[in-house]
A protein has these predicted regions:
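Glycine-rich, highly charged phosphate/nucleotide-binding loops
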Residues: 75-93, 304-318
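C-terminal hydrophobic structural anchor segments
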Residues: 309-354, 358
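Peripheral docking tails and interdomain loops at the edges
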Residues: 2-6, 344-391
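Metallocofactor- and cofactor-centric catalytic cores in central/energy metabolism, strongly enriched
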Residues: 2, 18-27, 31, 35-43, ...
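Anionic-ligand anchoring segments at beta-strand to alpha-helix junctions in alpha/beta enzyme folds, i.e.
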Residues: 52-77
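A charged, amphipathic alpha-helical module
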Residues: 2-36, 151, 155, 159-280, ...
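Redox- and metal-dependent alpha/beta enzyme cores, enriched for Fe-S-associated oxidoreductases
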Residues: 43-44, 49-61, 247-319
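Acidic/His-rich segments in extracytoplasmic proteins that coordinate ligands and/or metal ions
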Residues: 85-163
Length: 391
């Protein structure tokens, strides 16, 4: 299964996969043409402001196999291994050559620590090739007081983006960027419908490519390609196998999904930030621009990194029901404990409704380092009954 020939024969999908596989290409061309690029670390950096300023947002990502020469000098080994790999590219000059500035949101506790390390590193070793850094300090509790505080925080970030761009950003430009992002999210929802329907036609691996390519290219161009993929996929073969929902660690490439799909499962959804959660909520044009951005990022489905256990239980129940998944795979990397705290209560809730779960916790990264993992996936999938529908 995984990425099939029918998908690769689609010119639109092939174009998205080329961006996904060669993530620096568009940004390099953008800078060559005189544009500016802003790197994003954390899933709560508002693209709308960056796009409104005429700059290109790109996601900071790991590089499997890259020696962590600089990281080992500064970070403890108990950091999330993916974040350690991301830190290496920030500190060794890789991103200093590729982006003009770096925006960091406090999406996880480990990313907050990364920001503090970078801030101190820029202070005591200013010769290090670290790009200019801005930190977005959201409050994640959903009440009016915190909403006002978040609006003030985003006003400060807006001023920073204006400084990076060398010009002011108007409310009209933010609203226009919000509309562009909304169109992109709608196109991705149309794609997701072809995963979640009774006869799914897009694999989880293919979906990761379609979604993840948005992090490295111009947004309107991505929307057009996604819509063409949706049209092409109507004729792709129907997928057969137990319907599985994936939750846990972000998957920045398709390697792990390919293992699960090779075991015979159909991944119909996920709640991590390189998947479905990224396009979960729209920018509301009826609000003032800053409030609309706050609403969009703060009222998305709850993340395991910044939510109470009860909130995560309800959120996962909703997502599993929406995807009509037959089972749930929990998968977390070593030193990424937050999601594992939710698991006992989530397992209890799901299994009380007849939805089996499998937990893979404290896993080595990258996934191929886990001996016998493919066999464990096959064993779990073999216990599941049925095919493309639940119930």
């Amino acid at each position: 299964m995984s990425i099939r020939d029918c998908a690769l024969r689609s010119q639109a999908f092939a174009a998205l996969k080329d961006v996904y596989d060669h993530r620096e290409t568009v940004a390099a061309r953008w800078r060559t043409d005189g544009g500016k690029v802003v790197g994003e670390l954390g899933c709560d950096v508002p693209d709308e402001f960056i796009l409104a300023a005429g700059m290109l947002p790109v996601r900071v990502y790991d590089e499997v196999g890259k020696p962590l020469v600089e990281t080992d000098k500064y970070l403890e080994y108990a950091f999330d291994p993916v974040v350690r790999a991301q830190f290496e590219k920030i500190v060794d000059g890789t991103y200093d050559r590729q982006i003009d500035a770096l925006a960091i949101s406090n999406s996880t506790d480990v990313i907050i620590r990364i920001y503090l390390y970078l801030r101190e590193l820029r202070r005591v070793e200013p010769e290090k090739p670290v790009p200019p850094v801005e930190f977005i300090d959201w409050l994640f509790t959903r009440n009016r007081l915190h909403q006002v505080r978040n609006e003030q925080t985003l006003e400060l970030f807006r001023q920073t983006v204006e400084r990076w761009a060398g010009r002011a950003i108007t409310d009209e430009e933010i609203a226009a960027a919000g509309a562009i992002c909304n169109e992109n999210r709608q196109a991705l929802r149309e794609m997701a419908a072809l995963r979640r329907c009774a006869q799914p036609r897009i694999t989880g691996s293919e979906a990761l490519v379609i979604i993840g390519s948005a992090f490295f290219m111009e947004r309107s161009a991505h929307t057009a390609l996604v819509r063409q993929v949706v049209a092409d996929a109507q004729s792709w073969p129907v997928l057969h196998g137990p319907r599985v929902f994936f939750t846990g660690s972000n998957q920045e490439d398709t390697a792990l999904y390919e293992q699960i799909e090779a075991a015979g499962a159909v991944i119909v959804g996920e709640d991590h930030d390189w998947g479905d959660r990224w396009y979960d909520r729209d920018y509301n044009p009826e609000y003032s621009p800053v409030r609309a951005v706050v609403d969009r990022y703060m009222l998305r489905e709850f993340s395991s990194k910044k939510a109470f256990v009860s909130q995560r239980v309800a959120a996962l129940d909703r997502e599993v029901d929406a995807s009509t998944a037959q089972a749930v795979v929990f998968y977390t990397n070593i030193y990424e404990e937050a999601a594992s705290w939710d698991y006992p209560s989530q397992k209890k809730s799901l299994e009380s409704r007849g939805i089996p779960t499998a937990c893979f916790a404290k896993m080595a990264w990258p996934a191929h380092r886990n001996e016998g993992l493919e066999g464990r996936f096959r064993a779990f999938v073999s216990t599941l009954k049925g095919g493309a529908s639940r119930g």
